[in-house]
Amino acid sequence: MQQTFEQISVVVQGPVQNYQGRTHHEEGITQRCLESIRTHLPGAKIILSTWPDQDLAGLDYDQLVISQDPGVNLVDGLPQFPKNYNRQLVSTQAGLAQVTTPYAIKLRSDNYLIGNEFVAIQHSFLKSESEHKVFEEKIVINSNLFRRTSHGRSVLMSPSDFFYFGRTANLIKFGNSHYSWIILLPNMLFRSCSRLPNRAIH
């Protein structure tokens, strides 16, 4: 009997396919992303959260969320790196706001799944009973670009932005905390980012 995942919604966020300056990705990357969800998370709801005027032809999703593009990050009128942080926050939060299932995944539209082991991993951890806990349950985040250092210096609050899985309410709280941090400390963003060829999530 095939396992189903009706308790999970997947928010696929970002521009779709090889859109404008996004030609460094493989052709049809968003279609591959959506197909991987159908394959590895049968029964899960797919929410595509993107921008106006995207080419949605041939894309398999259950719900579409369109947000106005906030543009690149600016500090004192100058573009900052990573330049699309505000875009990622807006599309992620808009998608999560539509989730009605207890669990959710945030997945970039240029990444894809190659398995569903992360569900069992998340469920294998006991709920934290600590008085200092932030979330009801653990959030699973992939390790690619989960930074401990940048340019030889230790950095804080620098998780990867490819993939999150956990309780929907916890992901919303996590996203809101990121929003507060980016507003308060815009100049503390790390300044370099490695390009990784492998964008698959196990």
Spell out what each predicted region is.
Residues 107-108:
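Active-site acidic Asp-centered loop
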Residues 1-31:
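N-proximal low-complexity "stem/linker" segments adjacent to membrane-targeting elements
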Residues 113-120, 124-202:
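Catalytic core and acceptor-binding pocket of nucleotide-sugar-dependent glycosyltransferases
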Residues 17-28, 76-84, 116-125:
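Short, flexible/disordered intra-domain loops and linkers
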Residues 104:
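Short aromatic/hydrophobic "clamp" motif used to bind/position activated sugar donors
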Residues 27-44:
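Short, acidic, metal-binding catalytic loop of nucleotide-sugar glycosyltransferases
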Residues 6-12, 37, 45-48:
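Hydrophobic targeting segments
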Residues 48-98:
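Active-site-proximal specificity loops/subdomain of glycosyltransferases
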